[in-house]
């Protein structure tokens, strides 16, 4: 999967821009505030229906516009398709794929799988289990068609269950929901575990490339005691759940644990090593996606020179090239990227005050 045409309108400081990206590495350079990161953000928005920089989507709409518009042609090995999105300041969003209206944003994610490596993405190891669950669930969503519906049902029933707990309902009332909840929770957990097991097989070799002197162990924890049946746990834990007003254990507490020896990776590794570990995780995900469903991710890498030294920039760019994926990389100066490449980039773009120019 790659974008061979991208149209951006009223997105942050980009009034209007047309790009024809290359299949491989696309270098986007310009000064801070020029709009180069906004191009990455626009691609992400097109694939996810939201920004990776702000939780308030209205903020990405140009101040002089009532809506933003994004459009792309996508090329795969089999065919070409078109995807379009309009986001209004009112909050309304319109999405079309090949001219047909799309109601679920999950369809965007399925159509356009995107991996992001930004200064903020390194929070994967620091911001607690939620970001690591999201990492697992991205892969589980793409690898198993059963996952999304099961995950939606877990969230729906968990919300109802927690409300019953806050209302101090008897367990007999909660038990009615638990039968369905347990079924979906166990399916979500099974798919997550299978995904992490498959990821681990690829990840070991990639980590050895990035961190050859470090033995990183990656494991999945399901969110409750592995020796206890979930149905039994929910029943015995009812008094505790009632006291807290929410379900203490379950798939909503799952985590991806990364350890070096007896220590969590974030305590054992330097900041530079942690950046490399996150890069390894993202690359492994992209490679596994290709292996499982024969679909390539699109990689968005923001401000690479400030995050990695020259040696590790070269290693990351080579690993990205090995995935065969389309890659968009930003930098202030193009030499910081080009000098780390074995072969020239597919395309280069210069951004200044929101205007995009292709460099021949």
From Swiss-Prot:
Keywords: ATP-binding, Cytoplasm, DNA damage, DNA repair, DNA replication, DNA-binding, Nucleotide-binding, SOS response. It comes from the Bacteria. One of its GO terms (biological process) is double-strand break repair. It is found in: Cytoplasm. One of its GO terms (cellular component) is cytoplasm. ATP binds at residues 30-37. The keyword Ribonucleoprotein does not apply. InterPro entries: DNA-binding_RecF, DNA-binding_RecF_CS, P-loop_NTPase, RecF/RecN/SMC_N, RecF_2. Gene3D superfamilies: P-loop containing nucleotide triphosphate hydrolases, RecF/RecN/SMC, N-terminal domain. GO terms for molecular function: ATP binding; single-stranded DNA binding. Belongs to the RecF family. The RecF protein is involved in DNA metabolism; it is required for DNA replication and normal SOS inducibility. RecF binds preferentially to single-stranded, linear DNA. It also seems to bind ATP. This is DNA replication and repair protein RecF. The gene is recF.
